[in-house]
Amino acid sequence: MRSLVTLCMIALCTILQAQEANIPKVFTLGQSEKAYESLNQSYSKTLLEASNGDIKMAFDQWLLMMKEMDVYAERIDFDLNGVKLWLHVFWGANGKIDHMGYLLRSDSRNINDAELKAFFSSFMNRFTFPIKSDKPFNHYTGATFPTFSVKVNN
């Protein structure tokens, strides 16, 4: 019985890895739904959980990544200003971005889809998230560019 359970677990992991391998590193949300569901299962830990429940740290590190995207876009002369999207980021346990899914919001300015995918792909190859975890993790939220933030001291 124990070996049957082990065999089933190995088969499930193999199937999930195969499905994950079929999804591009950068993809449009709403495409490849089965592969996307597989990513959500493989990266089931949230950014907040990876931050040990510290919402301030999770938010600050997310904001840092958004600002790094702004800086990188400016450095390579890629105009992100006015882009508004839903963004789902999947990190490996080591903080490297493994996958990014996005969907432009209806109030976003138009941007070439292939160029945006190329930008995200290039960015994720250069950026490592400061938070590390015992398991892969993810975060899904809205993002707008440029990134504005103001610290308020209470």
Predicted regions: what they are:
Residues 1-24:
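Bacterial Sec-dependent N-terminal signal peptides
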Residues 19-154:
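Charge-biased low-complexity segments
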